[in-house]
Amino acid sequence: MSDSKEITKVIVTMVVISAVAAALLALTYTPTQAQLKLLQAEQQKEAMKEILPQAADFEPVTGSEVDDDGNPVVLYYKGVDSSGNVVGYVVERNQVGAQGMIQLLAGISSDFSTITGFQVMKHSETPGLGALITTPEFQGQFVDLPVADTSLTKNGGQVDAISGATISSQAVVDALHSAVDYVSAQEG
């Protein structure tokens, strides 16, 4: 009898501890998520300024879909100068890389002829190989690069692939072409 009482006592204790831990986790989750969203929005704004520096402001272009919070989903951003003239576009693209999804922001000139730059926002590429898509040396190749030349050198373009990470390099090129095609179809 005493063994079953001991087992019951241990089980009840574990259930109470688990319930308290779950309650604490639930209490901290919501404020943490809100703070995380604010931080991500700030990082995105900084990245947009870097890849389209001639823009004084970014106007969101939304579609008919809404997110989980009921806000319209942003399709892309129009970069405008201080007079309100469109100087380019910034669009988020997701592309499958060698190890997972690569999420990047692409800057495109207002006439859709030039990549103004890009920033990787998230990735799960191999450290020391595919992760080198985040380096200034790789990303610098795309600053003011004509869209027609936005392909790897092995394919006749002007982009040097990262040695040992051709799939990741090609994924970036594909994402940039997808970005240009998408925005030009929406705006053109």
Curated annotation (Swiss-Prot):
EC number(s) stated in the UniProt entry for this protein: 7.2.1.-
Null allele phenotype: Deletion of the rnf operon abolishes growth on acetate and ferredoxin:heterodisulfide oxidoreductase-coupled Na(+) transport.
Gene3D superfamilies, per database record: 3.90.1010.20
Alphabetized GO MF terms: electron transfer activity; FMN binding; oxidoreductase activity, acting on NAD(P)H
GO CC terms, sorted: oxidoreductase complex; plasma membrane
GO terms (BP aspect): electron transport chain
Residue ranges that the UniProt entry lists as topological domain Extracellular: 31-188
Main location: membrane
PANTHER family cross-referenced by the UniProt entry: ION-TRANSLOCATING OXIDOREDUCTASE COMPLEX SUBUNIT G
Enzyme category, top tier: translocase
Quaternary organization: The Rnf complex is probably composed of eight subunits, including RnfA, RnfB, RnfC, RnfD, RnfE and RnfG.
Keywords tagged on the record: Cell membrane, Electron transport, Flavoprotein, FMN, Membrane, Phosphoprotein, Translocase, Transmembrane, Transmembrane helix, Transport
Cofactor: FMN
Protein name in the entry: Ion-translocating oxidoreductase complex subunit G
Similarity section: Belongs to the RnfG family.
Organism whose genome encodes this protein: Methanosarcina acetivorans (strain ATCC 35395 / DSM 2834 / JCM 12185 / C2A)
Protein location: Cell membrane
Function: Part of a membrane-bound complex that couples electron transfer with translocation of ions across the membrane. Catalyzes Na(+) transport, most probably coupled to electron transfer from reduced ferredoxin to methanophenazine and heterodisulfide reductase. Involved in heterodisulfide reduction during methanogenesis from acetate.
Cytoplasmic compartment segments: 1-9
TM spans (from-to): 10-30
Transport in keyword set: yes
Topological category with respect to the lipid bilayer: Single-pass membrane protein
Keyword Cell membrane: yes
NCBIfam families noted in UniProt: rnfG, rnfG_Methano
Location of FMN phosphoryl threonine modifications: T166
